[in-house]
């Protein structure tokens, strides 16, 4: 009786406590689904992965690879290698303890929930990729039912993950190493040792040689910019400017703390996939400086070879092939690199490299480097090489096909230019091929390097496991690493290209430029004799014709703007038509007389103008200033006009024989003063038949025009234009003095015909510029025709 009453009281007392725990949550599974029958045994290890367990019994039923608690404990130590993946380690610890050391009570073992299993899939992708999940850890519904609470979920694990070198801990998802969430690659490239880094940085410091050479080239061009600013030589100025700026971007890393700022992120990881919103722009700025300058420089190289090719084809002519095209050079050269740079920044493929100390495209993804670096450089190699070879062939053709037309100086310059072009082309193509070879070396071996690095990271994880299990620690090393020598050769190709571009100013002309510059800066006089081109001296004399008119005895002084110096790029600016640039003193002293003889110096009261009205005195001063820049299009139209005029003048003799010439019409423009007659240069002919003046033409009477008018210029012995004439007339001429003064020209020559044809003034000629004159067929009388024509503009 009393025992029964005691049992009843105990049941009533315990009943209310257990009843509230019986109802399950709406999301929780029934108790029979969250448990499984198993043999419970007392825990031999009171902790799991360093954290104390809140229960005393467990079972090895859920861990298929363990038959005892000792085996389960050993397997947990093996799984501890995931400490090197911090985010994975944070979520996998509860799962491992719930499987290897689950709670077991009353012959029932608790099953972990589906949520606990799924939480480990994304952070622990390295397990799936490297080993694969074992079957008992796969998130199947029978092993991991939905909505089952687990006692292990309430445990707070004290051990947190860590990142073994060469990985560092970071909370930036963009810095995480693949499949290892929470860790990123350290800023210093792990494929190279610390010693190799220092050696490479010392090597990069030698890029200052490129900076010095290119800067010297730029300074040389600027010092003599007036003579150097000519295409195609000035293109070398832009090429050297591009390589100078690019070299500045490479050595910017040597400023205090600049290298880490350029190639490292704030969390100590390597910059990959720039630009990003939460990082500084130092990496992007260095990339733009280096890449944009490099691409602009190689495109300028194409423009240089094209300019050489077209300029060499136009040697010996007045045609300027580059006139009007230089603006397109700038448009193409500056716009294409800009588009490529913007495209790279848009796809965020700028990576930092601690070895080179710069940011560039495609250090991680080599496909972008092939598309944005090798493809443009390869195209430049093909196009530039074509124009360079054509230019050399053109020079060789000029030298071999026209040896008699070339002066000794021009031939020497052609030989020098061909030699320099050959050396320059060899260096340029050699450096480009070296660059291609280094990049292909990277492309073919990058996958192997990445695989070796991944194995090294896994080996470091095994070191952690060996430390936990007191097993021998394995030796970890990166088996396949890139060659430092190849990296040096690649940088040497870049710096060597810049140096080769600067060699074009390593000439004697550069020394003379700097000597003149030093004399100009210090105020000293330059005692070197000046070389003046005849064309520039004549142009200077014509421009000073007003001063020469006022003072005929004065001597011309030529300023430095008239003196023709060789530019720094000697050998490219040569004239195959001018035998020498030196001018003799006798020739220079007679320049003023030549200008006067050509009709450039006129009396003050005489004005020659293309209009038919006199020019007022106050406007005559402006008539002497003539500035013209004839474009190729205007020259082409002028040539077409001359050809059409020549075709019109070519008429048959039958039509020309019946023409007559109308008398000259008076002009309101003042005529030039009559020049004195000059003595003849031949002896007096002894016989009448020796002269070239026929008395009467066939079919015409005395004094008639006709065919004689068209041919008179080739035979009439004028005293100025044709001095090879008798010094005095024949006796017949003395008896018949000929036409009166009104029928004579200003130079003393007779005007033909002496009187109009009988029966009228004849047919008016309209082919020439003035009525009354026959077509001009002789260049010897061109001066006479110009002086006669009142409408001609001198």
UniProtKB/Swiss-Prot annotation:
Q: What is this protein called?
A: Protein smoothened
Gene name, per UniProt, is SMO
Q: How does it sit in the membrane?
A: Multi-pass membrane protein
Q: What does this protein do?
A: G protein-coupled receptor which associates with the patched protein (PTCH) to transduce hedgehog protein signaling. Binding of sonic hedgehog (SHH) to its receptor patched prevents inhibition of smoothened (SMO) by patched. When active, SMO binds to and sequesters protein kinase A catalytic subunit PRKACA at the cell membrane, preventing PRKACA-mediated phosphorylation of GLI transcription factors which releases the GLI proteins from PRKACA-mediated inhibition and allows for transcriptional activation of hedgehog pathway target genes.
Extract the signal peptide range.
1-15
Q: Which CDD domains does this one have?
A: 7tmF_SMO_homolog, CRD_SMO
**Which organism encodes this protein?**
Gallus gallus
Q: Which family does it belong to?
A: Belongs to the G-protein coupled receptor Fz/Smo family.
Q: Is the keyword Transport assigned to this protein?
A: no
**Which portions of this protein are annotated as coiled-coil regions?**
none
Q: Where are the transmembrane segments?
A: 202-222, 232-252, 284-304, 328-348, 372-392, 421-440, 494-514
Its quaternary organisation is: Homodimer.
Sites of glycosylation? 25, 158, 278, 462
Annotated compartments: Cell membrane; Cell projection, Cilium
What InterPro entries does the entry give?
A: Frizzled/SFRP, Frizzled/Smoothened_7TM, Frizzled_dom, Frizzled_dom_sf, GPCR_2-like_7TM, SMO_7TM, SMO_CRD
Query: What Pfam families would the database entry show?
Result: Frizzled (PF01534), Fz (PF01392)
PROSITE patterns, sorted: FZ (PS50038), G_PROTEIN_RECEP_F2_4 (PS50261)
Alphabetized, the UniProt keywords read: Cell membrane, Cell projection, Developmental protein, Disulfide bond, G-protein coupled receptor, Glycoprotein, Membrane, Receptor, Signal, Transducer, Transmembrane, Transmembrane helix
Record keyword Repeat present: no
What pairs make up the disulfide bonds? 34-148, 40-104, 48-97, 88-124, 117-139, 163-183, 187-264, 283-359, 459-476
